[in-house]
Amino acid sequence: MREIISIHIGQAGIQVGNACWELYCLEHGIEPDGTMPSDTTVGVAHDAFNTFFSETGAGKHVPRAIFVDLEPTVIDEVRTGSYRQLFHPEQLISGKEDAANNFARGHYTVGKEIVDLCLDRVRKLADNCTGLQGFLVFNAVGGGTGSGLGSLLLERLSVDYGKKSKLGFTIYPSPQVSTAVVEPYNSVLSTHSLLEHTDVAVLLDNEAIYDICRRSLDIERPTYTNLNRLISQIISSLTTSLRFDGAINVDVTEFQTNLVPYPRIHFMLSSYAPVISAEKAYHEQLSVPEITNAVFEPSSMMAKCDPRHGKYMACCLMYRGDVVPKDVNAAVATIKTKRTVQFVDWCPTGFKCGINYQPPSVVPGGDLAKVQRAVCMISNNTAVAEVFSRIDHKFDLMYAKRAFVHWYVGEGMEEGEFSEAREDLAALEKDYEEVGAEGADDENDDGEDY
């Protein structure tokens, strides 16, 4: 088997995780208590969904996941929620005091105490796998736990499981909406280790997803539940081919191979279509060309950044439901003729497609309509640099005055780490600039020197 372990860190990671596991269970027909009426072979783990669920002798399906937070309130919601019987109690790890939006607390003081316990649990999950394929890591980089403990765990996973791929689903601070003053510090410090220790990172940002909910689903005031359900659809689409037997399957390592041209250039944009409410879906014909066009729309991007400002280096289209390769090829051919979707000159083809015949499921009583077919796109576009330059700018404004820095230094960090992380991000922005430059291979051959 090619198992995958999911790690959900901090409030954002846990709440997105909740939405994901709820959706996985619906897709596989697994009840909230872990039983699966349709699974006739009890205790035999040879089905495709066993990449994400392990099976006990009693026929209970347990997610291969751990939830970690430095304070108990969010995890207590999982412990008492409707899926409380699904998870093994040891998979829900919480500390007593939170990271207080402080990267240094999550990474050095408070996080250090809990990280060995987490790795211990990960080790147990890994021992339970026959051929561990990699990790999915869910966190936000604006807070303290997601950024600090998130980076710490990633660093330790690199040491313990060096060859296994790590995919991050990372929630970045939004341009306008902010939940903490020190977000820019936490994000810069955390991205510093995301650069080194993840193989692919998918950037999400709340504001972009709010806008999609408002515009496409007509939800006047979207809640985190609305956002997380939309995020979970994306993550579900990406992992469909790992959990179901499909037509054109896509492996986790395949994402890396097809999307990452240089090790550092691994921050992806994602989009999903059709995002449509039930009332509207009734009147619309959502054909393959239509949904394919929709995922390339700047307004469908799940991070606030305009792909028209950059160039595509690679792009992964994952279709699910009633889709045949002929339609996909036609739709992709149309996209290629469009002037709006520009590829870098050194990567002329740039499309990787996956098809899975399992139609998308929706959470009952949720916002999304039940549709026959859907597509999720993950793309590597040079415009992602906008996300970083935005955060860097805010970082610079605060750091010039050394505002709030004493909170970090007081938790055992050194001021040098700030400038080191900031320089790393400046280099990253430069890397993106060079990759998008025209005819890059002629003038400078130093692109491979990383």
Swiss-Prot record:
It catalyses: GTP + H2O = GDP + phosphate + H(+). Coiled coil: none annotated. The active site is at 254. Undergoes a tyrosination/detyrosination cycle, the cyclic removal and re-addition of a C-terminal tyrosine residue by the enzymes tubulin tyrosine carboxypeptidase (TTCP) and tubulin tyrosine ligase (TTL), respectively. Its main location: cytoplasm. CDD domains: alpha_tubulin (cd02186). Its EC number is 3.6.5.-. GO terms for molecular function: GTP binding; hydrolase activity; metal ion binding; structural constituent of cytoskeleton. Dimer of alpha and beta chains. A typical microtubule is a hollow water-filled tube with an outer diameter of 25 nm and an inner diameter of 15 nM. Alpha-beta heterodimers associate head-to-tail to form protofilaments running lengthwise along the microtubule wall with the beta-tubulin subunit facing the microtubule plus end conferring a structural polarity. Microtubules usually have 13 protofilaments but different protofilament numbers can be found in some organisms and specialized cells. This is Tubulin alpha-1 chain. It comes from Oryza sativa subsp. japonica. The gene is TUBA1.
